[in-house]
Amino acid sequence: MTIASERTPVLELRNITLHYGSVEALHDVSIKSYAGEVIGLVGDNGAGKSSLIKVISGVNTADSGEVIVDGVRRHWRSPHDSMAAGIETLYQDSGLAPDLSIGSNIFLGREKRRSGLLGRLGFVDQRAMEKEALEQLARVGITIPATQRTVSELSGGQRQAVAIGRAIAWAKHVIVLDEPTNHLGARQSAEVLNVIKSAREQGLSVIFISHSLPHVLEVTDRIIVLRLGRVVRDAPTSEFTVESLLGTITGLNESTGS
Amino acid sequence: MSTSVDALVTTVKSQSRVRRVVTNQQFVLFVVLIALILFFASRNSLFFRVGEFSNLFTDFSGLVLIALAETYVIVAGGIDLAVGSTAAVSGVVAAGWIQPLVNHGVNQAVILLVGTLACAVVGALAGGLSALLITAFDLVPFVATLVTYSVGAGLALVISHGAPVGYNPGAIYWSASGIGMITWLVAIVLVVAVVLGVVLHLTVYGRYNFAIGSNEFAARAAGIAVRRHLISVYVLAGVLAGLTGMFFYIRSGSGAATTGVTNSANLVAIAAVVIGGASLTGGVGRWAGTMLGAAVLTVVSDGLIFINVPPTWIQVVVGALIAVAALLQSFRRRSRRVP
Protein backbone atom coordinates (compact mmCIF):
# COMPACT_ATOMS: atom_id res chain seq x y z
CA MET A 1 0.00 0.00 0.00
CA THR A 2 1.17 3.47 -0.83
CA ILE A 3 1.21 6.53 1.40
CA ALA A 4 -1.83 7.88 -0.42
CA SER A 5 -4.03 5.18 1.04
CA GLU A 6 -3.60 6.63 4.52
CA ARG A 7 -5.42 9.78 3.41
CA THR A 8 -9.16 9.88 2.88
CA PRO A 9 -9.91 9.76 -0.84
CA VAL A 10 -11.86 12.81 -1.97
CA LEU A 11 -13.87 10.50 -4.22
CA GLU A 12 -14.23 6.78 -3.92
CA LEU A 13 -16.32 4.36 -5.98
CA ARG A 14 -16.85 0.92 -4.46
CA ASN A 15 -17.98 -2.14 -6.42
CA ILE A 16 -19.95 -0.19 -9.02
CA THR A 17 -22.02 -2.27 -11.42
CA LEU A 18 -24.14 -0.73 -14.19
CA HIS A 19 -26.33 -2.32 -16.84
CA TYR A 20 -27.94 -0.81 -19.92
CA GLY A 21 -30.71 -3.32 -20.44
CA SER A 22 -28.97 -6.66 -20.72
CA VAL A 23 -25.57 -5.11 -21.49
CA GLU A 24 -23.20 -4.89 -18.55
CA ALA A 25 -21.37 -1.58 -18.90
CA LEU A 26 -19.52 -1.66 -15.59
CA HIS A 27 -18.68 -4.70 -13.47
CA ASP A 28 -17.53 -4.36 -9.84
CA VAL A 29 -15.51 -1.19 -10.51
CA SER A 30 -13.70 0.36 -7.54
CA ILE A 31 -11.53 3.46 -7.80
CA LYS A 32 -10.18 6.10 -5.41
CA SER A 33 -9.07 9.62 -6.22
CA TYR A 34 -7.22 12.02 -3.96
CA ALA A 35 -6.92 15.77 -3.68
CA GLY A 36 -4.07 17.19 -5.73
CA GLU A 37 -3.89 14.11 -7.90
CA VAL A 38 -4.55 13.62 -11.61
CA ILE A 39 -5.92 10.21 -12.56
CA GLY A 40 -5.88 9.03 -16.13
CA LEU A 41 -8.88 6.89 -17.06
CA VAL A 42 -8.14 4.97 -20.25
CA GLY A 43 -9.64 2.11 -22.19
CA ASP A 44 -10.82 1.13 -25.63
CA ASN A 45 -14.17 2.24 -27.02
CA GLY A 46 -16.89 0.52 -25.01
CA ALA A 47 -14.57 -0.14 -22.07
CA GLY A 48 -16.91 1.80 -19.79
CA LYS A 49 -15.12 5.16 -19.39
CA SER A 50 -18.14 7.30 -20.25
CA SER A 51 -20.44 5.06 -18.20
CA LEU A 52 -18.17 5.44 -15.21
CA ILE A 53 -18.09 9.23 -15.37
CA LYS A 54 -21.86 9.30 -15.76
CA VAL A 55 -22.10 7.38 -12.50
CA ILE A 56 -19.71 9.87 -10.88
CA SER A 57 -21.70 12.85 -12.15
CA GLY A 58 -25.14 11.43 -11.43
CA VAL A 59 -26.36 11.30 -15.04
CA ASN A 60 -26.70 7.53 -14.54
CA THR A 61 -27.32 5.69 -11.30
CA ALA A 62 -25.37 2.50 -10.65
CA ASP A 63 -27.32 -0.73 -10.19
CA SER A 64 -25.15 -1.54 -7.19
CA GLY A 65 -22.11 -0.13 -5.44
CA GLU A 66 -21.31 2.99 -3.47
CA VAL A 67 -20.21 6.53 -4.26
CA ILE A 68 -18.28 8.08 -1.36
CA VAL A 69 -17.25 11.73 -1.28
CA ASP A 70 -14.86 12.86 1.47
CA GLY A 71 -15.63 9.74 3.47
CA VAL A 72 -19.39 10.18 3.27
CA ARG A 73 -21.57 7.77 1.34
CA ARG A 74 -23.68 9.65 -1.20
CA HIS A 75 -26.54 8.91 -3.52
CA TRP A 76 -27.05 11.09 -6.59
CA ARG A 77 -30.65 11.51 -7.67
CA SER A 78 -29.54 13.83 -10.49
CA PRO A 79 -26.43 15.68 -11.71
CA HIS A 80 -27.56 18.52 -9.50
CA ASP A 81 -26.60 16.52 -6.40
CA SER A 82 -23.06 15.78 -7.56
CA MET A 83 -22.55 19.41 -8.57
CA ALA A 84 -23.68 20.50 -5.12
CA ALA A 85 -21.09 18.10 -3.65
CA GLY A 86 -18.32 19.88 -5.57
CA ILE A 87 -17.92 17.50 -8.51
CA GLU A 88 -17.78 19.07 -11.96
CA THR A 89 -17.84 17.15 -15.21
CA LEU A 90 -16.78 18.20 -18.69
CA TYR A 91 -18.61 16.01 -21.17
CA GLN A 92 -17.18 15.09 -24.49
CA ASP A 93 -18.49 17.53 -27.12
CA SER A 94 -21.89 17.99 -25.55
CA GLY A 95 -21.69 19.95 -22.32
CA LEU A 96 -22.72 23.37 -23.61
CA ALA A 97 -25.99 24.78 -24.92
CA PRO A 98 -24.89 26.33 -28.24
CA ASP A 99 -27.76 28.80 -28.52
CA LEU A 100 -27.12 30.35 -25.11
CA SER A 101 -24.52 33.02 -24.42
CA ILE A 102 -21.17 32.15 -22.88
CA GLY A 103 -22.24 33.76 -19.63
CA SER A 104 -25.52 31.83 -19.58
CA ASN A 105 -23.60 28.60 -20.16
CA ILE A 106 -21.13 29.27 -17.35
CA PHE A 107 -24.10 29.76 -15.02
CA LEU A 108 -26.33 27.04 -16.51
CA GLY A 109 -28.23 25.37 -13.69
CA ARG A 110 -26.82 27.94 -11.25
CA GLU A 111 -28.46 31.10 -12.58
CA LYS A 112 -27.90 34.22 -10.53
CA ARG A 113 -31.16 35.86 -9.61
CA ARG A 114 -32.09 39.48 -9.18
CA SER A 115 -32.23 40.70 -5.62
CA GLY A 116 -35.49 41.06 -3.72
CA LEU A 117 -38.95 40.18 -4.99
CA LEU A 118 -37.95 39.86 -8.64
CA GLY A 119 -35.37 37.26 -7.70
CA ARG A 120 -37.91 35.28 -5.77
CA LEU A 121 -40.17 35.39 -8.82
CA GLY A 122 -37.35 33.77 -10.78
CA PHE A 123 -35.90 36.76 -12.62
CA VAL A 124 -32.29 36.19 -13.69
CA ASP A 125 -29.59 38.82 -13.26
CA GLN A 126 -28.08 38.53 -16.73
CA ARG A 127 -25.71 41.46 -16.38
CA ALA A 128 -24.15 40.11 -13.19
CA MET A 129 -23.81 36.66 -14.78
CA GLU A 130 -22.02 38.01 -17.86
CA LYS A 131 -19.66 40.03 -15.66
CA GLU A 132 -18.89 37.21 -13.25
CA ALA A 133 -18.52 34.73 -16.11
CA LEU A 134 -15.65 36.84 -17.47
CA GLU A 135 -14.07 36.95 -14.02
CA GLN A 136 -14.46 33.23 -13.45
CA LEU A 137 -12.93 32.39 -16.81
CA ALA A 138 -10.08 34.84 -16.21
CA ARG A 139 -9.45 33.25 -12.82
CA VAL A 140 -8.73 29.92 -14.47
CA GLY A 141 -6.66 31.61 -17.15
CA ILE A 142 -9.14 31.85 -20.00
CA THR A 143 -9.86 35.15 -21.69
CA ILE A 144 -12.89 35.46 -23.95
CA PRO A 145 -13.64 38.84 -25.47
CA ALA A 146 -17.41 39.09 -25.08
CA THR A 147 -19.49 36.71 -22.99
CA GLN A 148 -22.78 37.85 -24.56
CA ARG A 149 -21.81 35.96 -27.69
CA THR A 150 -23.60 32.65 -28.14
CA VAL A 151 -21.51 29.50 -27.95
CA SER A 152 -22.56 28.58 -31.51
CA GLU A 153 -20.52 31.56 -32.72
CA LEU A 154 -17.31 30.24 -31.16
CA SER A 155 -14.65 28.06 -32.72
CA GLY A 156 -14.13 24.51 -31.46
CA GLY A 157 -11.16 25.54 -29.35
CA GLN A 158 -13.04 28.42 -27.80
CA ARG A 159 -15.99 26.18 -26.94
CA GLN A 160 -13.65 23.77 -25.25
CA ALA A 161 -12.05 26.64 -23.35
CA VAL A 162 -15.45 27.76 -22.09
CA ALA A 163 -16.42 24.21 -21.10
CA ILE A 164 -13.17 23.62 -19.24
CA GLY A 165 -13.33 27.05 -17.66
CA ARG A 166 -16.83 26.35 -16.42
CA ALA A 167 -15.87 23.00 -14.93
CA ILE A 168 -12.76 24.29 -13.16
CA ALA A 169 -14.40 27.48 -11.98
CA TRP A 170 -17.15 25.55 -10.17
CA ALA A 171 -15.29 22.43 -9.04
CA LYS A 172 -14.62 22.33 -5.33
CA HIS A 173 -13.38 18.74 -4.99
CA VAL A 174 -13.31 16.74 -8.18
CA ILE A 175 -13.17 17.63 -11.84
CA VAL A 176 -13.88 15.02 -14.48
CA LEU A 177 -12.69 15.80 -18.01
CA ASP A 178 -13.94 13.52 -20.79
CA GLU A 179 -11.69 13.87 -23.85
CA PRO A 180 -10.92 17.57 -23.29
CA THR A 181 -8.21 17.58 -25.96
CA ASN A 182 -10.42 16.00 -28.62
CA HIS A 183 -10.55 18.02 -31.84
CA LEU A 184 -7.88 20.41 -30.56
CA GLY A 185 -4.59 21.27 -32.26
CA ALA A 186 -1.24 20.51 -30.66
CA ARG A 187 -0.77 23.93 -29.15
CA GLN A 188 -4.32 24.11 -27.82
CA SER A 189 -3.96 20.63 -26.33
CA ALA A 190 -0.79 21.70 -24.55
CA GLU A 191 -2.69 24.59 -23.03
CA VAL A 192 -5.45 22.29 -21.84
CA LEU A 193 -2.84 20.07 -20.19
CA ASN A 194 -1.44 23.16 -18.46
CA VAL A 195 -4.92 23.97 -17.16
CA ILE A 196 -5.15 20.43 -15.79
CA LYS A 197 -1.78 20.80 -14.04
CA SER A 198 -2.82 24.03 -12.41
CA ALA A 199 -6.10 22.45 -11.29
CA ARG A 200 -3.97 19.85 -9.51
CA GLU A 201 -1.88 22.63 -7.92
CA GLN A 202 -5.13 24.13 -6.65
CA GLY A 203 -5.70 20.89 -4.76
CA LEU A 204 -8.44 19.51 -7.00
CA SER A 205 -8.73 15.85 -7.77
CA VAL A 206 -8.72 15.52 -11.56
CA ILE A 207 -10.03 12.54 -13.52
CA PHE A 208 -8.76 12.80 -17.07
CA ILE A 209 -10.21 10.61 -19.81
CA SER A 210 -8.38 10.53 -23.11
CA HIS A 211 -7.51 8.37 -26.08
CA SER A 212 -4.28 10.30 -26.48
CA LEU A 213 -1.85 8.16 -24.49
CA PRO A 214 1.05 10.64 -24.65
CA HIS A 215 -1.24 13.25 -23.07
CA VAL A 216 -2.24 10.80 -20.36
CA LEU A 217 1.37 9.86 -19.61
CA GLU A 218 2.40 13.52 -19.53
CA VAL A 219 -0.16 14.91 -17.15
CA THR A 220 -1.36 12.12 -14.83
CA ASP A 221 -0.02 10.73 -11.54
CA ARG A 222 -1.89 7.44 -11.72
CA ILE A 223 -3.57 5.52 -14.51
CA ILE A 224 -6.64 3.32 -14.29
CA VAL A 225 -7.20 1.01 -17.24
CA LEU A 226 -10.72 -0.19 -18.02
CA ARG A 227 -11.50 -3.08 -20.30
CA LEU A 228 -15.01 -4.44 -20.98
CA GLY A 229 -16.38 -2.70 -17.92
CA ARG A 230 -13.73 -3.86 -15.44
CA VAL A 231 -10.67 -2.24 -13.92
CA VAL A 232 -7.74 -4.28 -15.25
CA ARG A 233 -4.90 -2.10 -13.93
CA ASP A 234 -4.57 0.74 -11.41
CA ALA A 235 -0.96 1.88 -11.03
CA PRO A 236 1.28 4.98 -10.84
CA THR A 237 1.91 6.57 -14.22
CA SER A 238 5.67 5.97 -13.86
CA GLU A 239 5.05 2.25 -14.32
CA PHE A 240 3.72 2.75 -17.85
CA THR A 241 5.12 3.47 -21.26
CA VAL A 242 2.98 4.14 -24.34
CA GLU A 243 3.62 0.55 -25.45
CA SER A 244 2.82 -1.14 -22.13
CA LEU A 245 -0.25 1.08 -21.68
CA LEU A 246 -1.51 0.19 -25.15
CA GLY A 247 -0.90 -3.48 -24.37
CA THR A 248 -2.91 -3.24 -21.16
CA ILE A 249 -5.77 -1.41 -22.86
CA THR A 250 -6.07 -3.97 -25.64
CA GLY A 251 -5.25 -6.94 -23.41
CA LEU A 252 -2.46 -8.10 -25.73
CA ASN A 253 0.21 -8.29 -23.02
CA GLU A 254 -2.03 -10.20 -20.67
CA SER A 255 -0.48 -13.58 -21.45
CA THR A 256 3.07 -12.33 -20.90
CA GLY A 257 2.06 -11.04 -17.47
CA SER A 258 2.75 -7.50 -16.37
CA MET B 1 -3.53 30.85 -11.59
CA SER B 2 -0.66 31.40 -13.90
CA THR B 3 -1.69 29.38 -16.91
CA SER B 4 -2.99 31.16 -19.94
CA VAL B 5 -5.22 29.60 -22.50
CA ASP B 6 -4.83 32.39 -25.01
CA ALA B 7 -3.91 29.77 -27.56
CA LEU B 8 -7.45 28.47 -27.35
CA VAL B 9 -8.85 31.84 -28.14
CA THR B 10 -8.85 33.26 -31.61
CA THR B 11 -10.77 36.43 -32.24
CA VAL B 12 -14.05 36.02 -34.02
CA LYS B 13 -14.60 38.40 -36.89
CA SER B 14 -17.50 40.62 -35.97
CA GLN B 15 -19.98 41.30 -38.73
CA SER B 16 -20.90 44.76 -39.86
CA ARG B 17 -23.61 46.64 -38.04
CA VAL B 18 -25.66 47.17 -41.20
CA ARG B 19 -25.66 43.48 -41.96
CA ARG B 20 -26.67 42.67 -38.40
CA VAL B 21 -29.70 44.97 -38.59
CA VAL B 22 -30.77 43.79 -42.04
CA THR B 23 -30.58 40.15 -41.00
CA ASN B 24 -32.42 40.77 -37.73
CA GLN B 25 -35.71 38.93 -38.19
CA GLN B 26 -37.68 41.12 -35.80
CA PHE B 27 -36.55 44.31 -37.53
CA VAL B 28 -37.43 42.94 -40.95
CA LEU B 29 -40.81 41.76 -39.70
CA PHE B 30 -41.57 45.15 -38.21
CA VAL B 31 -40.83 46.83 -41.54
CA VAL B 32 -42.95 44.23 -43.35
CA LEU B 33 -45.83 44.77 -40.93
CA ILE B 34 -45.81 48.55 -41.44
CA ALA B 35 -45.50 48.12 -45.20
CA LEU B 36 -48.46 45.72 -45.26
CA ILE B 37 -50.67 48.08 -43.27
CA LEU B 38 -49.75 50.99 -45.55
CA PHE B 39 -50.35 48.84 -48.63
CA PHE B 40 -53.82 47.72 -47.56
CA ALA B 41 -54.69 51.25 -46.46
CA SER B 42 -53.61 52.64 -49.83
CA ARG B 43 -55.86 50.15 -51.62
CA ASN B 44 -58.86 50.70 -49.38
CA SER B 45 -59.04 53.77 -47.16
CA LEU B 46 -61.58 52.05 -44.87
CA PHE B 47 -58.68 49.91 -43.57
CA PHE B 48 -57.56 52.79 -41.35
CA ARG B 49 -60.88 53.05 -39.53
CA VAL B 50 -60.88 52.41 -35.79
CA GLY B 51 -63.36 49.60 -36.33
CA GLU B 52 -61.03 47.70 -38.61
CA PHE B 53 -58.09 48.10 -36.23
CA SER B 54 -60.31 46.81 -33.47
CA ASN B 55 -61.04 43.75 -35.62
CA LEU B 56 -57.34 43.28 -36.25
CA PHE B 57 -56.60 43.35 -32.52
CA THR B 58 -59.37 40.86 -31.87
CA ASP B 59 -58.22 38.44 -34.57
CA PHE B 60 -54.64 38.85 -33.34
CA SER B 61 -55.76 37.96 -29.82
CA GLY B 62 -57.37 34.75 -31.03
CA LEU B 63 -54.02 33.67 -32.44
CA VAL B 64 -51.40 35.11 -30.13
CA LEU B 65 -51.85 32.85 -27.09
CA ILE B 66 -51.52 29.60 -29.02
CA ALA B 67 -48.66 31.12 -31.02
CA LEU B 68 -46.85 31.92 -27.76
CA ALA B 69 -47.69 28.45 -26.44
CA GLU B 70 -46.09 27.09 -29.59
CA THR B 71 -43.08 29.36 -29.03
CA TYR B 72 -42.42 27.84 -25.62
CA VAL B 73 -42.78 24.31 -26.97
CA ILE B 74 -40.69 24.90 -30.09
CA VAL B 75 -37.93 26.72 -28.19
CA ALA B 76 -37.82 23.71 -25.83
CA GLY B 77 -37.15 21.53 -28.88
CA GLY B 78 -40.67 20.13 -29.32
CA ILE B 79 -43.79 20.82 -31.36
CA ASP B 80 -47.44 20.92 -30.33
CA LEU B 81 -50.02 19.99 -32.96
CA ALA B 82 -52.80 19.80 -30.36
CA VAL B 83 -53.41 23.49 -29.59
CA GLY B 84 -56.23 23.94 -32.13
CA SER B 85 -58.40 21.04 -31.04
CA THR B 86 -57.58 21.71 -27.38
CA ALA B 87 -59.19 25.13 -27.85
CA ALA B 88 -62.22 23.42 -29.39
CA VAL B 89 -62.70 20.77 -26.72
CA SER B 90 -62.18 23.16 -23.81
CA GLY B 91 -64.61 25.69 -25.29
CA VAL B 92 -67.22 22.99 -25.82
CA VAL B 93 -66.80 21.46 -22.36
CA ALA B 94 -66.79 24.81 -20.57
CA ALA B 95 -69.82 25.98 -22.55
CA GLY B 96 -71.74 22.92 -21.38
CA TRP B 97 -70.68 23.37 -17.77
CA ILE B 98 -71.55 27.05 -17.49
CA GLN B 99 -74.83 27.03 -19.46
CA PRO B 100 -76.85 26.23 -16.28
CA LEU B 101 -75.32 29.33 -14.68
CA VAL B 102 -76.34 31.38 -17.73
CA ASN B 103 -79.86 29.96 -17.57
CA HIS B 104 -80.14 30.87 -13.89
CA GLY B 105 -79.08 34.44 -14.63
CA VAL B 106 -75.91 34.33 -12.55
CA ASN B 107 -73.67 37.40 -12.73
CA GLN B 108 -71.83 37.39 -16.07
CA ALA B 109 -68.42 38.06 -14.46
CA VAL B 110 -68.82 34.93 -12.33
CA ILE B 111 -69.91 32.89 -15.35
CA LEU B 112 -66.94 33.99 -17.43
CA LEU B 113 -64.47 33.39 -14.60
CA VAL B 114 -65.83 29.89 -14.02
CA GLY B 115 -65.71 29.26 -17.75
CA THR B 116 -62.12 30.49 -17.94
CA LEU B 117 -61.15 28.19 -15.09
CA ALA B 118 -62.92 25.26 -16.75
CA CYS B 119 -61.15 25.93 -20.06
CA ALA B 120 -57.79 26.15 -18.29
CA VAL B 121 -58.42 22.82 -16.53
CA VAL B 122 -59.49 21.01 -19.71
CA GLY B 123 -56.52 22.55 -21.55
CA ALA B 124 -54.16 21.43 -18.78
CA LEU B 125 -55.52 17.88 -19.04
CA ALA B 126 -54.96 17.89 -22.81
CA GLY B 127 -51.42 19.24 -22.35
CA GLY B 128 -50.91 16.68 -19.60
CA LEU B 129 -51.82 13.88 -22.01
CA SER B 130 -49.20 15.08 -24.49
CA ALA B 131 -46.65 15.46 -21.68
CA LEU B 132 -47.39 11.95 -20.40
CA LEU B 133 -46.96 10.40 -23.84
CA ILE B 134 -43.70 12.29 -24.38
CA THR B 135 -41.99 11.94 -21.01
CA ALA B 136 -43.31 8.60 -19.76
CA PHE B 137 -43.75 6.69 -23.01
CA ASP B 138 -40.97 8.36 -25.00
CA LEU B 139 -43.17 9.27 -27.97
CA VAL B 140 -41.74 12.04 -30.13
CA PRO B 141 -43.65 15.31 -29.59
CA PHE B 142 -45.01 15.28 -33.15
CA VAL B 143 -46.76 11.93 -32.65
CA ALA B 144 -47.77 12.51 -29.04
CA THR B 145 -49.44 15.84 -29.78
CA LEU B 146 -51.03 14.38 -32.92
CA VAL B 147 -52.69 11.85 -30.60
CA THR B 148 -53.89 14.65 -28.33
CA TYR B 149 -55.07 16.62 -31.37
CA SER B 150 -57.18 13.72 -32.65
CA VAL B 151 -58.58 12.86 -29.24
CA GLY B 152 -59.44 16.52 -28.61
CA ALA B 153 -61.06 17.08 -32.00
CA GLY B 154 -63.01 13.84 -31.65
CA LEU B 155 -64.21 14.51 -28.12
CA ALA B 156 -65.27 18.04 -29.10
CA LEU B 157 -67.48 16.55 -31.83
CA VAL B 158 -68.84 13.81 -29.54
CA ILE B 159 -69.70 16.27 -26.78
CA SER B 160 -71.19 18.94 -29.04
CA HIS B 161 -72.88 16.57 -31.53
CA GLY B 162 -71.47 18.93 -34.17
CA ALA B 163 -73.62 21.85 -33.06
CA PRO B 164 -72.79 24.97 -31.02
CA VAL B 165 -72.98 24.28 -27.27
CA GLY B 166 -74.89 26.73 -25.10
CA TYR B 167 -75.88 30.29 -25.81
CA ASN B 168 -74.72 33.29 -23.78
CA PRO B 169 -75.62 36.68 -25.34
CA GLY B 170 -74.17 38.46 -22.31
CA ALA B 171 -70.72 37.18 -23.21
CA ILE B 172 -71.01 38.46 -26.78
CA TYR B 173 -72.16 41.82 -25.47
CA TRP B 174 -69.21 42.03 -23.07
CA SER B 175 -66.74 40.97 -25.76
CA ALA B 176 -67.47 44.20 -27.67
CA SER B 177 -66.97 46.53 -24.70
CA GLY B 178 -63.73 48.35 -24.06
CA ILE B 179 -61.87 51.57 -24.67
CA GLY B 180 -61.39 52.77 -28.23
CA MET B 181 -60.10 50.02 -30.45
CA ILE B 182 -59.08 47.80 -27.52
CA THR B 183 -61.79 45.65 -25.97
CA TRP B 184 -61.42 44.38 -22.41
CA LEU B 185 -61.10 40.88 -23.82
CA VAL B 186 -58.21 41.93 -26.06
CA ALA B 187 -56.58 43.85 -23.20
CA ILE B 188 -56.61 40.74 -20.98
CA VAL B 189 -55.10 38.61 -23.74
CA LEU B 190 -52.38 41.21 -24.34
CA VAL B 191 -51.50 41.30 -20.63
CA VAL B 192 -51.17 37.50 -20.59
CA ALA B 193 -49.03 37.73 -23.73
CA VAL B 194 -46.69 40.25 -22.10
CA VAL B 195 -46.35 38.09 -18.99
CA LEU B 196 -45.43 35.13 -21.22
CA GLY B 197 -42.73 37.23 -22.89
CA VAL B 198 -41.28 38.34 -19.57
CA VAL B 199 -41.18 34.78 -18.26
CA LEU B 200 -39.60 33.47 -21.47
CA HIS B 201 -36.77 35.98 -21.63
CA LEU B 202 -36.13 37.21 -18.11
CA THR B 203 -36.65 34.30 -15.75
CA VAL B 204 -34.92 31.06 -14.83
CA TYR B 205 -37.90 29.11 -16.20
CA GLY B 206 -37.45 30.70 -19.62
CA ARG B 207 -33.71 30.17 -19.48
CA TYR B 208 -34.19 26.44 -18.86
CA ASN B 209 -36.61 26.35 -21.78
CA PHE B 210 -33.89 27.63 -24.13
CA ALA B 211 -31.22 25.41 -22.57
CA ILE B 212 -33.29 22.23 -22.99
CA GLY B 213 -34.12 23.02 -26.60
CA SER B 214 -30.53 23.94 -27.36
CA ASN B 215 -28.92 20.83 -25.86
CA GLU B 216 -31.05 18.56 -23.73
CA PHE B 217 -28.07 16.57 -22.46
CA ALA B 218 -26.20 19.72 -21.41
CA ALA B 219 -29.30 20.91 -19.57
CA ARG B 220 -29.66 17.59 -17.76
CA ALA B 221 -25.95 17.48 -16.94
CA ALA B 222 -26.21 21.01 -15.55
CA GLY B 223 -28.72 19.72 -13.02
CA ILE B 224 -31.88 21.01 -14.71
CA ALA B 225 -34.96 18.82 -14.12
CA VAL B 226 -35.60 18.36 -17.84
CA ARG B 227 -38.53 15.98 -17.61
CA ARG B 228 -40.39 18.11 -15.10
CA HIS B 229 -39.79 21.21 -17.22
CA LEU B 230 -41.07 19.56 -20.40
CA ILE B 231 -44.22 18.39 -18.61
CA SER B 232 -44.83 21.95 -17.45
CA VAL B 233 -44.31 23.35 -20.96
CA TYR B 234 -46.90 21.06 -22.58
CA VAL B 235 -49.35 21.71 -19.74
CA LEU B 236 -48.76 25.46 -20.17
CA ALA B 237 -49.41 25.13 -23.92
CA GLY B 238 -52.62 23.23 -23.14
CA VAL B 239 -53.77 25.91 -20.70
CA LEU B 240 -53.10 28.67 -23.25
CA ALA B 241 -55.03 26.69 -25.88
CA GLY B 242 -57.85 26.33 -23.34
CA LEU B 243 -57.87 30.08 -22.75
CA THR B 244 -58.07 30.57 -26.50
CA GLY B 245 -61.11 28.27 -26.45
CA MET B 246 -62.66 30.56 -23.85
CA PHE B 247 -61.77 33.59 -25.99
CA PHE B 248 -63.82 32.22 -28.87
CA TYR B 249 -66.63 31.18 -26.54
CA ILE B 250 -66.89 34.76 -25.31
CA ARG B 251 -66.90 36.16 -28.84
CA SER B 252 -69.56 33.80 -30.17
CA GLY B 253 -71.46 33.12 -26.94
CA SER B 254 -71.17 29.38 -27.42
CA GLY B 255 -68.64 26.60 -27.70
CA ALA B 256 -68.03 24.99 -31.09
CA ALA B 257 -66.10 21.88 -32.14
CA THR B 258 -64.89 23.75 -35.20
CA THR B 259 -62.96 26.35 -33.16
CA GLY B 260 -59.27 26.16 -33.98
CA VAL B 261 -59.80 22.98 -36.01
CA THR B 262 -61.36 23.99 -39.32
CA ASN B 263 -58.92 26.88 -39.71
CA SER B 264 -55.93 24.68 -38.72
CA ALA B 265 -55.09 27.06 -35.89
CA ASN B 266 -52.24 24.80 -34.80
CA LEU B 267 -50.50 25.25 -38.14
CA VAL B 268 -51.18 28.99 -38.21
CA ALA B 269 -49.62 29.24 -34.73
CA ILE B 270 -46.56 27.29 -35.86
CA ALA B 271 -46.36 29.55 -38.91
CA ALA B 272 -46.34 32.63 -36.67
CA VAL B 273 -43.46 31.15 -34.66
CA VAL B 274 -41.45 30.23 -37.74
CA ILE B 275 -42.05 33.62 -39.36
CA GLY B 276 -40.92 35.12 -36.05
CA GLY B 277 -37.51 33.54 -36.51
CA ALA B 278 -37.64 30.53 -34.20
CA SER B 279 -35.79 27.36 -35.10
CA LEU B 280 -37.79 24.14 -35.25
CA THR B 281 -34.70 22.34 -33.94
CA GLY B 282 -35.10 24.20 -30.66
CA GLY B 283 -33.11 26.66 -28.61
CA VAL B 284 -33.83 29.67 -30.81
CA GLY B 285 -36.88 31.92 -30.76
CA ARG B 286 -38.05 35.27 -29.48
CA TRP B 287 -41.26 36.55 -27.97
CA ALA B 288 -41.13 39.68 -30.13
CA GLY B 289 -40.65 37.53 -33.22
CA THR B 290 -43.77 35.48 -32.53
CA MET B 291 -45.78 38.62 -31.70
CA LEU B 292 -44.74 40.19 -35.01
CA GLY B 293 -45.26 36.91 -36.85
CA ALA B 294 -48.79 36.65 -35.50
CA ALA B 295 -49.42 40.32 -36.32
CA VAL B 296 -48.21 39.90 -39.92
CA LEU B 297 -50.40 36.82 -40.40
CA THR B 298 -53.41 38.64 -38.96
CA VAL B 299 -52.92 41.73 -41.11
CA VAL B 300 -52.41 39.63 -44.24
CA SER B 301 -55.48 37.44 -43.62
CA ASP B 302 -57.74 40.40 -42.85
CA GLY B 303 -56.18 42.77 -45.39
CA LEU B 304 -56.51 40.42 -48.34
CA ILE B 305 -60.23 40.12 -47.64
CA PHE B 306 -60.36 43.91 -47.42
CA ILE B 307 -58.96 44.35 -50.92
CA ASN B 308 -61.30 41.67 -52.29
CA VAL B 309 -58.82 38.86 -52.71
CA PRO B 310 -60.74 35.56 -52.48
CA PRO B 311 -60.18 33.96 -49.05
CA THR B 312 -59.02 30.80 -50.80
CA TRP B 313 -55.86 32.64 -51.83
CA ILE B 314 -54.94 33.60 -48.30
CA GLN B 315 -53.31 30.27 -47.51
CA VAL B 316 -51.13 30.57 -50.59
CA VAL B 317 -49.92 33.96 -49.42
CA VAL B 318 -49.30 32.59 -45.91
CA GLY B 319 -47.26 29.79 -47.45
CA ALA B 320 -45.16 32.31 -49.36
CA LEU B 321 -44.61 34.29 -46.15
CA ILE B 322 -43.36 31.21 -44.32
CA ALA B 323 -40.99 30.44 -47.19
CA VAL B 324 -39.54 33.96 -47.17
CA ALA B 325 -39.11 33.90 -43.39
CA ALA B 326 -37.40 30.53 -43.47
CA LEU B 327 -35.05 31.67 -46.25
CA LEU B 328 -34.19 34.78 -44.29
CA GLN B 329 -33.38 32.68 -41.27
CA SER B 330 -31.20 30.29 -43.19
CA PHE B 331 -29.34 33.25 -44.72
CA ARG B 332 -28.81 34.76 -41.29
CA ARG B 333 -27.53 31.51 -39.85
CA ARG B 334 -25.04 31.08 -42.68
CA SER B 335 -23.77 34.64 -42.37
CA ARG B 336 -23.19 34.21 -38.63
CA ARG B 337 -21.45 30.86 -38.65
CA VAL B 338 -17.76 30.91 -37.86
CA PRO B 339 -15.64 28.96 -40.34
Predicted features by range, described:
Chain B
Residues 2-67, 102-115, 232:
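Membrane-interfacial amphipathic/re-entrant helices at transmembrane-helix boundaries
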Residues 32-48, 156-161, 197-204:
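Structural signal for alpha-helical transmembrane segments and their membrane-water exit/capping regions
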Residues 34, 38-43, 48-102, 132-142, ...:
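Single transmembrane alpha-helix segments in multi-pass membrane proteins
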Residues 256-319:
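Transmembrane alpha-helical segments in multi-pass inner-membrane proteins
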Residues 137, 141-203, 229-232, 251-264, ...:
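Transmembrane helix-bundle core of multi-pass membrane transporters
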Residues 1-38, 221-228, 300-339:
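Cytosolic-side transmembrane-helix boundaries in multi-pass membrane proteins
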Residues 111-119, 125-130, 181-256:
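Helix-loop-helix "hairpin" substructures at the membrane interface of multi-pass membrane proteins
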Residues 102-149, 292-293:
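Alpha-helical transmembrane segments within multi-pass membrane transporters and channels
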